[in-house]
Amino acid sequence: MEQAAKATISLSPPSYAGCCMAACPYRSTRHLRRGGGCSARSISSLRHAPSARVYAAAAAAATPESKSTKENDLVFIAGATGKVGSRAVREFIKLGFRVRAGVRSAQRASSLVQSVEQLKVDDDATSPAERLEIVECDLEKQAQSDIVSAIGNAAIVVCSIGASEKDILDVTGPYRIDYMATNNLVQAATAAKVEHFILVTSLGTNRIGFPAFLLNLFWGVLCWKRRAEEALIGSGLPYTIVRPGGMERPTDAFKETHNLVVAVEDTYVGGLVSNLQVAELIACIASNRRTAYCKVVEAIAETTAPLLPTEDQLANIPSKRQPPPEPEVVQQGETPPKPIQQSQRPLSPYTAFVDLKPPSSPSPCPPSAAAPAPTSTDTAAAGSSSTLNSSATGTPISVDQPKQQQRPLSPYTRYEELKPPSSPSPTPPSAASSASVSASPDTPPAAAASSAALDSSANGTPITGDQLNQQQSPLSPYTRYEELKPPSSPTPSTPKL
């Protein structure tokens, strides 16, 4: 049965020649089990869809092992023959997905198959028709197990069903389709453990406003759509709810003059958007499931809106739940990377910015080899200097180290013009003037003795004969100014014998 499910439709397949399921693929599983035969209408419908694959009977015979393994490139679309669903099928096929289209009646899917066959895709490996699978699935009447079999191993489920606008007199239409059928699909998707569920509802499902609230005149359709949203949120499945604006009047060319706007829930109560733009948004959500994880978005189109990527607009919408961490894929035989040893960052910024480093003080030059031999005085000074000039660790510098020239503390050694004028130093008297003063006949010996006592040093020690020659200036001004010298008292003459 699984081989027959994957085989292309043919009137005479090699292993199922004459089988009713091969000749009449559009018959449902329930009809085949009753032994229903093929009609001329069913065979004529095959001429319009020779390349489509039908999984109506094969889905029921799928093994549990095939259900447990989900295929990320396989999408199940409920309402694939509708305005949004048919465009979503084509958009998914353009992006490289395989689509399993769930329809009520396979006869009505012929136009969908023809539109898919006319697509032009970049991938020449498989034709667009080979990526489409038609499966009959009535969400209102079939049991949950049949719906799970129809979903199969699809990883993504898209629900774009809704009550028909033509049956406006059907009072129970919004309840049966917008709520009950959607709820049945949600429960089946939960049982099938799909990875993402995309639900298309409408503006105003959670906010009362004009003109969206006028849709509730159609037998409370917004209230039932809100009940379907609550059922999906409470199921625990990863979901994305799309609330588009009015899609009745805009055509596919609407996107050429109106840019798509993706907003947070309960932002708009009115607006227009085309079916094609909503289908492109659904395909973008399926391609970026982690970005659209558990989000409720509203979609309208405006002429004044900027043209922004849909992925960026989805990323700005807050999520209802935190997405799970991505699993780490570790290949067999792959050695773990070695930890990178990070060098310590220096505290000084001068290592990175050399131009900011302040100028260093000039280093003293070592003495040349032709320097004169140090005297005993220099050796003693060097010994005391070695004790004072110790390093930061307290180790004294040995005498054997070369004597370094100390930097002078005064700036006058480099800048002579800043040096203040020095006070005039008195010139020492000559030896002739000192001898004339001491040999003057007018000076009595007592005055000379008193002068010697007065001309003493600061500590009271009388000046000796050797120190008298080194005396700088006499204390008496009479040596220079004779006219100021007072008259000396007459010296008595010695008596003559």
Swiss-Prot record:
It is found in: Plastid, Chloroplast inner membrane; Plastid, Chloroplast stroma; Plastid, Chloroplast thylakoid. Residues 310-497 are annotated as: Disordered. Pfam families: NAD_binding_10. Residues 1-55 form a transit peptide. It is a peripheral membrane protein. Residues 370-387, 430-458 have a biased composition (Low complexity). Its main location: plastid. NADP(+) binds at residues 75-104. GO terms for biological process: protein transport. Keywords: Chloroplast, Membrane, NAD, NADP, Plastid, Plastid inner membrane, Protein transport, Repeat, Thylakoid, Transit peptide, Transport. It comes from the Eukaryota. GO terms for cellular component: chloroplast inner membrane; chloroplast stroma; chloroplast thylakoid membrane protein complex. Sequence repeats lie at residues 346-367, 408-429, 474-495. Residues 359-369, 487-497 have a biased composition (Pro residues). Involved in protein precursor import into chloroplasts. Part of the redox regulon consisting of TIC32, TIC 55 and TIC62. Acts as a membrane anchor of LFNR1 and LFNR2. Has a NADPH-dependent dehydrogenase activity, but only after preincubation with lipids. This is Protein TIC 62, chloroplastic. It comes from Oryza sativa subsp. japonica. The lineage of its organism: Eukaryota, Viridiplantae, Streptophyta, Embryophyta, Tracheophyta.
